Amino acid sequence: MAGHSKWANIQHRKGRQDAKRGKLWTKIIREITVAARAGGADPDSNPRLRMAWDKATDANMPKDNIQRAIQRGAGGADGESYEEVRYEGYGIGGAAVIVDCMTDNRTRTVAEVRHAFAKHGGNLGQEGSVAFMFKHCGQFVFAPGTSEETVMEAALEAGAEDVATDEEGVIEVVCAPADFTAVRQAFEAAGLKAEVDGVVMKALNETELTGEDAVKMQKLLDVLESLDDVQEVYTNVVFDEAQ
């Protein structure tokens, strides 16, 4: 696919997320609170809280903020009670989109998500309409130039499912969600730092968009990610390198 660079797409998305750091902190605090409420305040016995804690650390969130969010969740303090809800839909050219939310008002959230899809050339689908196009897994992406041998050794010893290197030298490691923390710790012990990592919905097949379609799709994704209740947006779209 001419102009399609996986590394450029990763860098582009990471740059957009970094630019929204204030909103990112809000999302992570919500994630920490929900994780602590569901599984307790000890990250060593609460894998979901451990992942949220690591995400907060990577985002340079002060430890005091993290601890307050844990205490608020584990203490069962009165206030908002969030539920997790997933929406599925289609973007430009039938591209698949998954929107994961945490909300205290499902009616408000679905209205906002539906409006975003409709206004920007997409449409909200039924439950299950696109989820089959994605795999729920742990994912680590390493920059070109990273030692493939070192990554491979650490990954497989920690129980990763797959290690793949593309023509640009980008190394991708996939593992079961339950093994994510163990694999991450194995990489840290080996002195490796992934450019991007997380438990994600990984697209099984990609749809490339270029030109005006790419611009419109990027706008839809930006609007969805800007909604207060939205935690994560996944898509099977890759953009032309020039976008």
From Swiss-Prot:
Coiled coil, from the record: none
**Region (Disordered) residue spans:** 1-21
Residue ranges annotated as transmembrane are none
Specify one Pfam family.
Transcrip_reg
Task: Please name the SUPFAM superfamilies in this protein's record.
Answer: YebC-like
* Location relative to the cell: Cytoplasm
- GO cellular component terms given for this protein: cytosol
Keyword terms, alphabetized: Cytoplasm, DNA-binding, Transcription, Transcription regulation
Q: Which InterPro entries match?
A: Integrase-like_N, TACO1_YebC-like_2nd/3rd_dom, TACO1_YebC_N, Transcrip_reg_TACO1-like, Transcrip_reg_TACO1-like_dom3, YebC-like
Q: Which GO terms describe its molecular function?
A: DNA binding
Q: Which GO terms describe its biological process?
A: regulation of DNA-templated transcription
Q: Which domain of life is it from?
A: Bacteria
- What family does this chain come from, according to its entry? Belongs to the TACO1 family.
UniProt protein name:
Probable transcriptional regulatory protein BP2308
